[in-house]
Amino acid sequence: MLTHLDSQGRANMVDVTEKAVTEREATAEARVRMLPQTLQMIVEGEHPKGDVFAVARIAGIQAAKKTSDLIPLCHPLMLTSVKVELSAEGTDAVRIVARCKLAGQTGVEMEALTAASVAALTIYDMCKAVDKGMVIEQVRLLEKLGGKSGHYKVDA
């Protein structure tokens, strides 16, 4: 059942008024593949635009807070925690893991996915002058806790 459609098939924001406030958490990831020398520049702090990981982390946090401005039917949420972690993966990729939490009436999956996506886009933006062939991939939900639909964890 598509929850964002009314009985006439029109898009609407889901009414969560009667839903109980519960603790909710979601974790998402994204990867940015790049040339090994691009990753080396980032890791060694030699990028001319500054600390790529720090800027991407802040962008991801800000994006999570702005999700309802970007995704039309998302509820504006009072997030209680947003964490964005970036790490080198092998010799040619950055892995981004975003985790969002709140006590509320609706989940935070879109906020976690948005945080990971925008952090990846920020890496691309900062590094495109040296590596136009970067690929953003594997944007996905890793885990969701809380709410009526219960626990979800991606298969390893």
Swiss-Prot record:
Lineage: superkingdom: Bacteria
The metabolic or biological pathway listed in the UniProt record of this protein is: Cofactor biosynthesis; molybdopterin biosynthesis
**E.C. no:** 4.6.1.17
Query: In which residues is substrate bound?
Result: L73, C74, H75, M110, E111
Residues of the active site are: D125
Entry keyword set? Lyase, Molybdenum cofactor biosynthesis
EC primary class: lyase
Under the heading InterPro entries, the entry gives: MoaC (IPR023045), MoaC_bact/euk (IPR047594), MoaC_sf (IPR036522), MoCo_biosynth_MoaA/MoaC (IPR050105), Mopterin_CF_biosynth-C_dom (IPR002820)
Subunit structure as annotated in this protein's UniProt entry: Homohexamer; trimer of dimers.
What is the name of this protein?
Cyclic pyranopterin monophosphate synthase
The organism named in the record is Pseudomonas putida (strain W619)
